[in-house]
């Protein structure tokens, strides 16, 4: 089949342009990794893939042709739109307007609503796909114009395939946090000193783009904008924590920047625990690729049961009930046990690694092909 995969400017411009001839040089988010992994997975299965996005240049790699947006804007030139079998837009359904109804048009929605989409966007989509059923239901609740019968679930994939090398590294007593800082880092800042008091060798390694977020949200004081005000409180609290504890290991705390995926693999594989006391201001986590990556890396994921986490990772990760505010002691006790109980580590690690193999890029691509086949049978 011939695929058009579109990663639009609304999602890609804040993070691009991307070097598609060396994508490994980027520190990709879970959604970005999913896109580029599907480009590779579908081409590896023998399909022709034209990838449209905010690239540094036009580039051909085997069965993949990368087409950059023209003129530095959102102009997308599609050679012969009717020649495609399937067009998939990542979170931006407006790009599907150019394709005729003869092309199967899918929108893979990673965001939590559609306020940026143009009027009538839903009329140009044959199927909306969501990473979890809870995410699907949330988006439908805030976007009633979408027909529930035109929706489905297609889970994300691992951000990297380098986890399954069989190599095992010394994990020490390292705890890692590698998600957006607004989603729960403030709780970890409260919990870690208590953990370190009981496990003196404990280290906390924080990844992702903390400083840009802190500089922006640390100035948010307006109580009439509750979501921004809440983030401002979190930013100032975490800033005070790093000021007190240091960022280079003085008190066991290390603040890292966003890093390329291969470095993130190494960081997760050398960590004993992924601690994610997720507590978003609004619905945020429709899947949580960082948790999936931790599963594959053999780090013990300790997460809160919010948004889609219980649905996706229940029975695999250690999922603590409710929001962290109602389970402070449980969070500290669980992290201490995960750092010190080798039997628990072996049990959880084995379970998580087996779970993660269901989410390789090849497995996700094959599921997509089944979805496409089913849609075609229904249309016949």
Where are these regions (language model features)?
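A charged, aromatic-enriched C-terminal amphipathic alpha-helix characteristic of glycosyltransferases
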Residues: 30-33, 342-373
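Extended catalytic core of nucleotide-activated donor transferases of GT-like folds
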Residues: 37, 52-139
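Donor nucleotide-sugar binding/catalytic pocket of nucleotide-sugar-dependent glycosyltransferases
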Residues: 126-141, 145-163
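Nucleotide-activated donor-binding/catalytic signature segment of Leloir-type glycosyltransferases, i.e.
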Residues: 218-265
């Amino acid at each position: 089949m011939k695929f058009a995969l579109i990663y639009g400017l609304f999602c890609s411009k804040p993070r691009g342009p991307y070097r598609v001839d060396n994508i490994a040089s980027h520190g990709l988010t879970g959604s970005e990794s999913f896109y580029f992994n599907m480009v590779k997975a579908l081409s590896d299965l023998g399909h022709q893939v034209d990838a449209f996005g905010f690239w540094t240049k036009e580039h051909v790699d085997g069965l993949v042709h990368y087409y950059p947006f023209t003129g530095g804007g959102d102009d997308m030139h599609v050679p012969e739109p009717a020649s495609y079998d399937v067009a998939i837009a990542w979170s931006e359904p407006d790009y599907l307007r150019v394709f005729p109804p003869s092309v199967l048009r899918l929108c893979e929605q990673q965001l939590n609503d559609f306020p940026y989409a143009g009027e009538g966007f839903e009329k140009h989509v044959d199927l909306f796909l969501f990473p979890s059923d809870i995410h699907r239901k949330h988006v439908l609740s805030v976007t009633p114009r979408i027909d529930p019968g035109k929706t489905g679930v297609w889970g994300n994939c691992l951000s990297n395939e380098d986890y399954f090398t069989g190599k095992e590294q010394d994990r020490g007593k390292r705890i890692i946090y590698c998600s957006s800082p607004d989603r729960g880092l403030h709780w970890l800042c409260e919990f870690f000193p208590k953990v370190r008091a009981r496990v003196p060798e404990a280290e906390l390694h924080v990844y992702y783009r903390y400083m840009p977020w802190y500089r922006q949200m640390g100035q948010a004081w307006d109580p009439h904008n509750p979501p921004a005000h809440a983030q401002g409180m979190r930013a100032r609290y975490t800033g005070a924590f790093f000021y007190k504890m240091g960022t280079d290991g003085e008190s066991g705390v290390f603040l890292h920047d966003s890093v390329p995926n291969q470095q993130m693999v190494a960081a997760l594989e050398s960590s004993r625990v992924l601690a994610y006391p997720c507590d978003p201001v609004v619905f945020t986590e429709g899947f949580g690729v960082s948790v999936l990556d931790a599963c594959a890396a053999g780090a013990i994921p300790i997460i809160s049961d919010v948004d889609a986490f219980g649905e996706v990772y229940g029975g695999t990760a250690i999922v603590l009930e409710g929001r962290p505010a109602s389970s402070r002691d449980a969070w500290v006790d669980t992290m201490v046990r995960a750092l010190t109980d080798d039997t628990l580590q072996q049990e959880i690690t084995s379970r998580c690694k087996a779970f993660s193999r269901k989410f390789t890029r090849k497995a996700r691509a094959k599921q997509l092909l089944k979805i496409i086949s089913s849609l075609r049978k229904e249309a016949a």
